[in-house]
Amino acid sequence: MRIVIYSMLVLLIAIQYPLWLGKGGWLKVYEMEKQVELQEAKNSLLALRNAKLEGDVKDLKDGTRAIEERARVEHGLIKEGEFFVQILPADQSSADTAKASTVKQ
């Protein structure tokens, strides 16, 4: 009788092994679900980035406002008749003024 019980126990373990640790077992399914969640998070970030880039491209194709903004920000260009004003933080302004006054002398 013991032999039958032990053999049944061994067969039960042999049947359960693929379910838990095999190629398509629960552990693999759990790992895959985690990978899918990570990939979905990455995809949503990339979709937001793509939407922003698509808006930039559309604005560059259709309007001049984006081109003017890029020229101002990236290249420091200004329109004719405009004045460029740069406001420095309070701690930097006195130090830069002192440097400028010593350089001019």
Swiss-Prot record:
Residues of the signal peptide: none
Coiled-coil annotated spans: 32-60
A single GO cellular-component term on record: cell septum
Domain of life, per lineage: Bacteria
All ranges on the Cytoplasmic side of the membrane: 1-3
Subcellular localization, as worded in the UniProt entry: Cell inner membrane
Keywords, in A-Z order: Cell cycle, Cell division, Cell inner membrane, Cell membrane, Coiled coil, Membrane, Transmembrane, Transmembrane helix
Membrane-spanning intervals of the chain: 4-21
UniProt-listed GO biological process terms: FtsZ-dependent cytokinesis
InterPro entries from the UniProt entry: Cell_div_FtsB, FtsL/DivIC
Membrane topology: Single-pass type II membrane protein
Pfam annotation, one family: DivIC
Topological region Periplasmic: 22-105
PANTHER family assigned: CELL DIVISION PROTEIN FTSB
Known role: Essential cell division protein. May link together the upstream cell division proteins, which are predominantly cytoplasmic, with the downstream cell division proteins, which are predominantly periplasmic.
Summary of subunit composition and partner proteins: Part of a complex composed of FtsB, FtsL and FtsQ.
Family of this protein: Belongs to the FtsB family.
Protein name from the UniProt record: Cell division protein FtsB
Gene: ftsB
